[in-house]
Amino acid sequence: MSSTFKQYWLPEKKGFDSLQLRNVPKETPRLGQILVRLKAVSLNWRDGIVAIGTYPFPGPDAVVPGSDGAGIVEEVGEGVTEWKVGDRVLANFTQDHIAGRLTRDIGLTQLGGEQQGLLGEFFIFPKTGVVKIPDYLSFEEASCLPCAALTAWNALYGLTPLRPGQTVLLQGTGGVSTFALQIAHVAGAKTIVTSSSDEKLEKAKALGATFGINYRKTADWAAEAMRITGGKGVDYIIEVGGTLTLQASFDAIGFNGQINCIGHITNPDPLGAGKDLRGPDASFLALDRLCVVRGVVVGSREQLQDMLDCFEAKKIRPVIDSVFSFDKTREAYDHLWSSTHTGKIVIQIP
């Protein structure tokens, strides 16, 4: 057995060309740890902004990217009784977020940004840093769940649980929005998906979307959402745009609704060049609609397990846009940044 393994890292954060493949020593798990042979890692938009150096949270100057991975337990350390060699596991995005509220200190244990990530052949986890993969899911499918799926679950169930008959508006067809669509559909909710592409909207409808709005053809998608809901507005919004879409989200939300702020893809550098972009008066607009504006940063291990229980009961499968081999990781990043995908981008690890 080799004493080293292959791993991608970013010695500097100056773009996707900074990605380098290296050999690193394979260590033995210590007390309370497990060694996992990773079989698949999926990418999130966050991985892109980490690579280009605009990720707005603290982290090491040089980092191993990748937060979402799945694999097989290869070795267990002393004191580990929860896992055995051969178990199929997937990563918990925020390693120390076991249950309850996220704190700033716990947030510093997020993989692939605040601490070293998974884009390699092996990783040593604490025994609480993983959960069991449901039997019906492949490694590639399981690797899609830790960030995007759990974020969607937290958005719809973390504060006020979604109820049948309510309406959820989903911006775009990226990972979080697609998972939120699948979750809302099995919950009996109505869904409105916005996209710049009729083709993507057709794919969303195949997943159960009730309505689709092409915002290139219907620029005022908030007014269209109001029309669809008979002037009442929507109950939940998956807000991934940020500065340039937040006003429209306020225009589309109903009274006592919930705007879940997930990302800021219209402003990928919010603390740099984009910090001067003027957004809406959120305080006034929240009062005007009596709505909740909530930042959602993934979720806890407990929520991840709850989500997996639901997924297994309903046999929800992630939508995978494309699968790249480990040696095509750079191309996977390019595809991520092209915004032409629907669903998740996965990297297979041999």
Question: Model regions: which residues?
Answer:
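Glycine-rich phosphate-binding loop and adjacent beta-alpha segment
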Residues: 106-108, 187, 240-322, 348-350
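C-terminal capping/lid region of NAD(P)-dependent oxidoreductase domains
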Residues: 2-5, 231, 315-322, 330-350
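Adenosine-nucleotide cofactor-binding segment
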Residues: 167-173, 185-248
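NAD(P)H dinucleotide-binding glycine-rich loop of Rossmann-like/cofactor-binding domains
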Residues: 93-171, 199
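Short N-terminal strand-loop motif that marks the start
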Residues: 1-70, 125, 216, 338, ...
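N-terminal Rossmann-fold NAD(P) dinucleotide-binding loop
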Residues: 177-178
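Glycine-rich beta-strand-centered segment in the early N-terminal region that forms part
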Residues: 25-41, 54-98, 114-116, 134-137
